[in-house]
Curated annotation (Swiss-Prot):
Belongs to the ATG12 family. GO terms for biological process: autophagosome assembly; autophagosome maturation; autophagy of mitochondrion; cytoplasm to vacuole targeting by the Cvt pathway; glycophagy; piecemeal microautophagy of the nucleus. The gene is ATG12. There is a cross-link at G164 (Glycyl lysine isopeptide (Gly-Lys) (interchain with K-148 in ATG5)). It comes from Candida albicans (strain SC5314 / ATCC MYA-2876) (Yeast). Ubiquitin-like protein involved in cytoplasm to vacuole transport (Cvt), autophagy vesicles formation, mitophagy, and nucleophagy. Conjugation with ATG5 through a ubiquitin-like conjugating system involving also ATG7 as an E1-like activating enzyme and ATG10 as an E2-like conjugating enzyme, is essential for its function. The ATG12-ATG5 conjugate functions as an E3-like enzyme which is required for lipidation of ATG8 and ATG8 association to the vesicle membranes. Keywords: Autophagy, Isopeptide bond, Membrane, Protein transport, Transport, Ubl conjugation pathway. This is Ubiquitin-like protein ATG12.
Length: 164
């Protein structure tokens, strides 16, 4: 049996009684607060997101077109984007400079394509708008969506590191 004894000030009895009651109330509130239980992620529920009406209609049209006609239009699945290749420094240029390529291709595919066109043994350094080197596994479509200029993706290439 433990007891806590609080001393009160001699000057003002009301202030002392308030302080002693305020000191004892936090301990009561700590005892009354329940301890949160941890719930593992395996018990969580995954809610399905409903598609907006416009996207739902496009999806249903796409599935109907593939079952009825046997194929889907090239415009919906095989999105081609324009890429302009610009040489940096003494790297030889290719003709023509503008090519169409599928949006699902990766940067490493572009690198192999340029090496084949230039008959270059090794790896070229590719830059998006002369500012940064994209990752080799990055898709061209995502880069095009972020960095297109006049409906073209400008990719500069060099056989040495051009920008530190």
């Amino acid at each position: 049996m433990s007891r806590i004894i609080h001393s009160e000030d001699d000057d003002d009895d009301d202030v002392g009684s308030q302080s002693s009651s305020s000191l004892s109330s936090p301990s009561k509130s700590l005892q009354q607060d329940p301890i949160p239980t941890k719930i593992p992620l395996s018990t969580s529920i995954i809610l399905e997101k409903k598609l907006p009406l416009e996207q739902h209609q496009k999806l249903s049209n796409l599935t109907e077109g593939s079952t009825a006609g046997g194929h889907v239009s090239n415009n919906s699945l095989d999105n081609k984007i324009m890429i302009r290749f610009v040489p940096i420094g003494s790297t030889p240029s290719i003709q023509p400079r503008v090519f169409k390529i599928s949006a699902t291709q990766t940067v490493s595919t572009l690198n192999r394509f340029l090496c084949k066109k230039l008959k270059f043994k090794g790896v070229l350094n590719l830059y998006i708008q002369n500012s940064f080197m994209p990752l080799p596994d990055e898709q061209i479509g995502s880069l095009y969506g972020l960095f297109k200029t006049n409906n073209e993706l400008i990719i500069s290439y060099c056989n040495t590191i051009a920008f530190g």
